[in-house]
């Protein structure tokens, strides 16, 4: 039920472990902090981490006549969340499904969740390019999709996978809103100095090569990592850190694109 959603944004990554779900959740929280009504759909069936990141693992989804009712992060209902993680008894439970069953579940997530009026729906996708991604693209053909944000890290292997992701988006007709480079340097929790651990500037160079916007560079910040599992917005808890600055600028960019 996407007819009540104004803007749909996909968050993609070429490989796992680049912080895609963290970017998705903090982006959703930042939009909600800016008084937007937001939905966050986690379709990473084999590795659903959104319920954990938002501190919602003990919550259940319910069904009504109109479909599944998403989980809300607060009484204000500014952020609604749906994930297969809510349907599993334990976080360690494995989803061992073949392609057709995964496809059916993703279609159900996209068509049968009873979202309220939403300004933004953020879709956190699995890493790579697979059946799940093709299903999402097919289901979104009939609705307006703002585009995709691609998350990468500075390592050459991650950048190589992002090149494939860029090609996938172009072939499937999904606009690329830009590239976010995550884990670029380590911020010392004592002096706040940022030290490069991997190579630097890869995300920016790749954005130039692919002729898409570079949306920001996020460092490894232990203070931000401590927010995992709390459901707290980085922009509210750590307003002066680099990650918050990048997230606020990202939201400004997205809201400008959506106008």
Curated annotation (Swiss-Prot):
Origin, by domain of life? Eukaryota
The UniProt record gives the binding positions of ATP as 14-21
Q: Does the keyword Lyase apply?
A: no
Binding residue positions for [4Fe-4S] cluster: 188, 191
Annotated transmembrane regions: none
Which cofactors are named for this entry?
[4Fe-4S] cluster
Show the disulfide pairing. none
Tell me the PROSITE patterns matching this sequence: MRP
- Would you name any one GO CC term? cytosol
Q: Which SUPFAM superfamilies match?
A: P-loop containing nucleoside triphosphate hydrolases
As to how many cofactors bind and how, the note says:
Binds 4 [4Fe-4S] clusters per heterotetramer. Contains two stable clusters in the N-termini of Nubp1 and two labile, bridging clusters between subunits of the Nubp1-Nubp2 heterotetramer.
GO MF terms listed in the record are: 4 iron, 4 sulfur cluster binding; ATP binding; ATP-dependent FeS chaperone activity; iron-sulfur cluster binding; metal ion binding
GO biological process: one example: iron-sulfur cluster assembly
Subcellular location per UniProt equals:
Cytoplasm
Q: How does it assemble?
A: Heterotetramer of 2 Nubp1 and 2 Nubp2 chains.
Q: What role does this protein play?
A: Component of the cytosolic iron-sulfur (Fe/S) protein assembly (CIA) machinery. Required for maturation of extramitochondrial Fe-S proteins. The Nubp1-Nubp2 heterotetramer forms a Fe-S scaffold complex, mediating the de novo assembly of an Fe-S cluster and its transfer to target apoproteins.
Instruction: List the HAMAP family.
Output: Mrp_NBP35, NUBP2
Which family does the record assign?
A: Belongs to the Mrp/NBP35 ATP-binding proteins family. NUBP2/CFD1 subfamily.
Recorded protein name is: Cytosolic Fe-S cluster assembly factor Nubp2 homolog
The species this protein belongs to is: Anopheles gambiae (African malaria mosquito)
